[in-house]
């Protein structure tokens, strides 16, 4: 862009005119003190007339207050400042005015009034009329409350609980607790039923004890002759089947406490040996853990067992000793350690 008569004044006027033309959108000054340099003849085509915002003034015109201004769609208030009869006014499409922000009374609001009733009672009486229009008609102004959506109603869920808390009635609270926890009401009935069952078990146990005593006394009464007892002892030593029967009878006669044939849990141990046999085998095991063939045959003849039975018993006893020693060692090691 080149100008025929370019001078510093003309250049400054052009820059000032462009800046003022661009800035005239944001502010407007109707005072006579606004800076407006006179345009020259050379700059007529590049002056403020080309911008379409402010008309250029001649030297003879002094009235700066009647200056016309453009109407922009995003500033509807400027339309009242300008003179519509001016020839320099450029017509713009009519714009819609910005609606004023005002609350209407026909807005659909929640009609149910709920929470915060205690807090709203503390409001100053002077503040209530200013917000009277916002409160729905169904709610009185004296007790305005916050509407709550329909999916959660505080009055429906906690109405009974609030009334009981305010009235301080223990009977009502007990009924509510029974409604909330129905299992607590059934506990006394269950306890009564348990007491009845315990009484029945005790009566049955007392009735079974004399029967056991009679059963234990009856074999002794049957075997009254000493000769028959000696014969039975000889038969038991000779035949292993009779030994198993005797061991079963001993298990029945013993109490269910932990014995050498009964475990602590009450179940029967898998032990086909009698007391006499186990005592003899234990003595030999304490003397020597490993047996030779000759010694094993002698023990089997004395205890009335086969060679294979004595061999298996010693193997099992060694495994048991190994297990017990391992458990004792672990117990000693863990006793010295402190677990945090």
Curated annotation (Swiss-Prot):
For whether the record's keyword set contains Transcription, the answer is yes
- Bias (Basic and acidic residues) ranges: 242-253
Q: Which UniProt keywords apply?
A: Developmental protein, DNA-binding, Homeobox, Nucleus, Phosphoprotein, Transcription, Transcription regulation
Q: State its location(s).
A: Nucleus
A Pfam family cross-referenced in the UniProt record is Homeodomain
Keyword Membrane in annotation: no
Q: List the disulfide bonds.
A: none
Region (Disordered), start-end ranges: 206-259
Sequence positions bearing Phosphoserine? 238-239
Mind listing where the DNA-binding region sits, in residue ranges?
266-325
The molecular function terms of the Gene Ontology recorded here are: DNA-binding transcription factor activity, RNA polymerase II-specific; RNA polymerase II cis-regulatory region sequence-specific DNA binding
Compositionally biased residues, Polar residues = 208-217
Q: Name one GO cellular component term.
A: nucleus
PROSITE patterns according to UniProt: HOMEOBOX_1 (PS00027), HOMEOBOX_2 (PS50071)
Q: Which SMART domains match?
A: HOX
Kindly list any coiled-coil regions of this protein.
Answer: none
Sequence similarity: Belongs to the Abd-B homeobox family.
PANTHER family for this protein: HOMEOBOX PROTEIN ABDOMINAL-B (PTHR45874), HOMEOBOX PROTEIN HOX-D10 (PTHR45874:SF5)
Record function comment = Sequence-specific transcription factor which is part of a developmental regulatory system that provides cells with specific positional identities on the anterior-posterior axis.
Name of this chain's protein: Homeobox protein Hox-D10
Task: Name the species this protein comes from.
Answer: Lagothrix lagotricha (Brown woolly monkey)
């Amino acid at each position: 862009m080149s100008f025929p008569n370019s001078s510093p004044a003309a250049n400054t006027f052009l820059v000032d005119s462009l800046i003022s033309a661009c800035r005239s959108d944001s502010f407007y000054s109707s005072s006579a003190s606004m800076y407006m340099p006179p345009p020259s003849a050379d700059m007529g085509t590049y002056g403020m007339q080309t911008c379409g915002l402010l008309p250029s003034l001649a030297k003879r015109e002094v009235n700066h207050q009647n200056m016309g201004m453009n109407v922009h769609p995003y500033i509807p208030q400027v339309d009242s400042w300008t003179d519509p009869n001016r020839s320099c006014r450029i017509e713009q499409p009519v714009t819609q005015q910005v609606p004023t922000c005002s609350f209407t009374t026909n807005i659909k609001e929640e009609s149910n009034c709920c929470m915060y009733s205690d807090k709203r009672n503390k409001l100053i009486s002077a503040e209530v009329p200013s917000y009277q229009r916002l409160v729905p008609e169904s709610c009185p102004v004296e007790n305005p409350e916050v509407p709550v959506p329909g999916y959660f109603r505080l009055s429906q869920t906690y109405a009974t609980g609030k009334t009981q808390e305010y009235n301080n009635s223990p009977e009502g609270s007990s009924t509510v607790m029974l409604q909330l926890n129905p299992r607590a009401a059934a506990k006394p009935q269950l306890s009564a039923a348990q007491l009845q069952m315990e009484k029945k078990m005790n009566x049955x146990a007392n009735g079974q004890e004399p029967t056991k005593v009679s059963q234990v006394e009856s074999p002794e009464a049957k075997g009254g002759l000493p000769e028959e007892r000696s014969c039975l002892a000889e038969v038991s030593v000779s035949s292993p089947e009779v030994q198993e029967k005797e061991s079963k009878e001993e298990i029945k006669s013993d109490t269910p406490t932990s014995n050498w044939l009964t475990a602590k849990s009450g179940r029967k141990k898998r032990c086909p040996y009698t007391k006499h046999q186990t005592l003899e085998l234990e003595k030999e095991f304490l003397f020597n853990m490993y047996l030779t063939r000759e010694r094993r045959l002698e023990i089997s003849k004395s205890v009335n067992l086969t060679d294979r039975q004595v061999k298996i018993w010693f193997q099992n006893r060694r495994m048991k000793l190994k297990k017990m020693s391992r458990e004792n060692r672990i117990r000693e090691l863990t006793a010295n350690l402190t677990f945090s």
